[in-house]
Amino acid sequence: MPRSPLIVAVVAAALFAIVRGRDPLLDAMRREGAMDFWSAGCYARGVPLSEPPQALVVFYVALTAVMVAVALYAYGLCFRLMGASGPNKKESRGRG
C-alpha cells in the first residue's frame, strides 16, 4: 500500500509537536497549576439556593407542564371510561 506524502508529513508534524512539547518551563507551569487546583475559597461557595439559576426555573416549569398534561390525559381517560355504560357500548371498545 503506497503511502501518501501528505500522510507522512502530517504524522511527522504530529511526532515533532509531541517531542517539542516536552518543554521544562511548560512542565513546571503544569505542576504549579496542579498544586493550585484546590482552593478553600472556591470550595466554600457552594450553590446559591436563595436565587435559583435560570436553568432550574425552566426545568420546574417544564416539569409542571408535563405533570399537568399527564393529569389532563388521565382525567379525560377516566371520564371516557366512566361515561361508557357497558362493555358492548361503541365508545368503550377498541378499534379492532
Swiss-Prot record:
The keyword Metal-binding does not apply. The lineage of its organism: Viruses, Duplodnaviria, Heunggongvirae, Peploviricota, Herviviricetes. It is a single-pass type I membrane protein. Coiled coil: none annotated. Keywords: Disulfide bond, Host Golgi apparatus, Host membrane, Membrane, Signal, Transmembrane, Transmembrane helix, Viral envelope protein, Virion. Belongs to the herpesviridae glycoprotein N family. One of its GO terms (cellular component) is virion membrane. Residues 22-54 are virion surface. Its main location: virion. Envelope glycoprotein necessary for proper maturation of gM and modulation of its membrane fusion activity. Also plays a critical role in virion morphogenesis. Residues 76-96 are intravirion. Residues 1-21 form the signal peptide. The keyword Transferase does not apply. GO terms for biological process: positive regulation of proteolysis; regulation of peptide transport; regulation of protein complex stability; regulation of protein maturation; symbiont-mediated suppression of host antigen processing and presentation of peptide antigen via MHC class I; symbiont-mediated suppression of host gene expression. One of its GO terms (molecular function) is tapasin binding. This is Envelope glycoprotein N. The gene is gN.
